[in-house]
Amino acid sequence: MEEIQRYLQLDRSQQHNFLYPLIFQEYIYALAHDPGLNRNRSILLENPGYNNKFSFLIVKRLITRMYQQNHFLISTNDLNKNEFLGCNKSLYSQMISEGFAFIVEIPFSLRLISSLSSFEGKKIFKSHNLRSIHSTFPFLEDNFAHLNYVLDILIPYPVHLEILVQTLRYWVKDASSLHLLRFFLHEYWNLNSLITSKKPGYSFSKKNQRFFFFLYNSYVYECESTFVFLRNQSSHLRSTSFGALLERIFFYGKIERLVEVFAKDFQVTLWLFKDPFMHYVRYQGKSILASKGTFLLINKWKFYLVNFWQCHFSLCFHTGRIHINQLSNHSRDFMGYLSSVRLNPSMVRSQMLENSFLINNAIKKFDTLVPIIPLIGSLAKANFCTVLGHPISKPVWSDLSDSDIIARFVRICRNLFHYYSGSSKKKTLYRIKYILRLSCARTLARKHKSTVRTFLKRSGSELLEEFLTSEEQVLSLTFPRASSSLGGVYRSRIWYLDIFCINDLANYQ
């Protein structure tokens, strides 16, 4: 641990370029396996099996094999002949990927620390609390009244392996590390089902998520470098915080140096970026770019992005992956929400001397609604209700104690309320709560061989209190006078930074 601290204290502008020797250091694999290095855990001192554990003995064997064979200089034609890892190929390759990902993250970490330290007087956010999904919250809170069109963009795919290596050349100057990456990609994984997937969504092996998240986010960063102009040209682009918003856990700060490069090489196209009302956000494998401009302007954006990505990444990116939609009559599935723009009609009466005028005005409002039909379908699949939304009992849980049954239903209800707290209309959530509450009552009544009416009379209001969500409890304490009628407060949208996805409804089979 002290050795890596000394390494991080070296000249950050030069020494981080030489990362290759770290691949032979044992502590790198320990840090990659357990960054906290909890001293109470003895797993690092064990000699376990090959599948799911780690030991220094296996690390020593791996490093010894790497010292004995200069396998990083082998050509791609001889990859199938290289058997230096022997029978432990799967385990050793996983360990190398974890160690390599940890090492390559060092330059990004140093750049991030340097950029955050430049903000004097500002508190540095803990990186593990910020992810790219959090940029969607201010995007949904933006004022969409002036926007007309939106671009739905699929991030370019598939990607050639060499493109991934070339992308990292801008950050990692160590040629040996790049040779190791190239060798590693060709030797150990068939990425046709991972990074180079022909599907818009990317899936990663659970054993090597850190390594592939690193590669994927590096590639996405290159794709998003085009939009750095927007942040500098527009004061309304509040959706992506390039200074503090981190992409994953450690180091993905948004660097603005690319602006200078683009400003010199693409003077002709800079006028496209002068729209003061552009909104950009990325989620999963898609991006959204909204504008107040005309159809002609947004169409120019479309062809510019297609040509830029084709030239920069040497891939065939056809225009069918970018769709132009008019915001006023288009709805989309967005992070589990059904998002749409609706017109709120209003009438204004104007009095001028003896004449009066009635002026009709329509204000655009961006709604984030709970998709009730898919959500009921998920509940029906998990046997909480029928496909029509009628609550039914959960026979699988009848053997559990009453407290466990209630706790499981309450947890699902609170998870759904927590995730969809940003909905502009909460009525659907209360319907979901009704389904889960009555399903819980039917399950308990089935267990005690009683009717629902009899069980509810015996339990009283305790079951209702259990299903009181944490949001309702907080609002009741904050607004005690309005605890009986919090309809107006519940209509406000609340966003939580610990929201990443909806937990599986059928976790407790």
UniProtKB/Swiss-Prot annotation:
One of its GO terms (molecular function) is RNA binding. GO terms for biological process: mRNA processing; RNA splicing; tRNA processing. It is found in: Plastid, Chloroplast. The keyword Plastid applies. Its main location: plastid. It comes from the Eukaryota. Keywords: Chloroplast, mRNA processing, Plastid, RNA-binding, tRNA processing. GO terms for cellular component: chloroplast. Belongs to the intron maturase 2 family. MatK subfamily. HAMAP family: MatK (MF_01390). PANTHER family: MATURASE K (PTHR34811:SF1). Usually encoded in the trnK tRNA gene intron. Probably assists in splicing its own and other chloroplast group II introns. This is Maturase K.
